[in-house]
From Swiss-Prot:
Any GO molecular function: neuropeptide hormone activity
Residues of the signal peptide: 1-20
Protein function: Myotropic peptides that enhance both the frequency and amplitude of spontaneous hindgut contractions.
Alphabetic keyword roster: Cleavage on pair of basic residues, Neuropeptide, Secreted, Signal
Name this polypeptide is given: Orcokinin peptides type B
Main location: secreted
Organism: Procambarus clarkii
Amino acid sequence: MTAQMFTIALLLSLSAIAAAGTIKTAPARTPSTQDDASFPPDGAPVKRFDAFTTGFGHSKRNFDEIDRSGFGFAKKNFDEIDRSGFGFNKRNFDEIDRSGFGFNKRNFDEIDRSGFGFNKRNFDEIDRSGFGFNKRNFDEIDRSGFGFNKRNFDEIDRSGFGFNKRNFDEIDRSGFGFNKRNFDEIDRSGFGFVKRVYVPRYIANLYKRNFDEIDRSGFGFNKRNFDEIDRTGFGFHKRDYDVFPDKRNFDEIDRSGFGFVRRNVE
């Protein structure tokens, strides 16, 4: 009986010690910071962003995607463009700004479709805006209806205004007289003239020599040092062919409608 009471007393003592906290258990696992970030108290996962997605203006540098916010801000060295409707400066980017505000652009591949006039330099495509401006060293042409100068471009100006052209491959289809030099195609004038290589033409009994196409322009003008011929309606002298034996040793002819003297021929 005494032993049973002693055992019961020992068990009660151990229970009291355990309740008092003298026997330490292993600490419970606390959630990590990463788990808190990935799973907030409501249990929904949090989406992580590398770039800003707020709707407020801020600066961004050296990132691949763009800010679609509707606020103006500065951007440098990024690949895509800002679609916001506010004016801002852009440098060295590949695509264009579709906003309707005027701004300056430099060294970009595509063009600004906005309806505001601005300067453009060293770009491949053209400005479709209806404002006059200067263009240099570009491949395509300006479809605007304003007169301007063009140099060193491949295609032609379809505008109806007279202007000067130099060193281009195609011709001016406008109905105005102008000078042409060093171009490959021809003038489609409807006037009679003499042509080399003795190819008679309709009733005018024209002579032709070493040319492929003709000038469709209806105005007389001067031509020098070009591969094809002038279709002006004026007579002139040609060297080195049988009809004019006093002329000699020249490759192409002068399409001007006036007589002239040539020197330093063999």
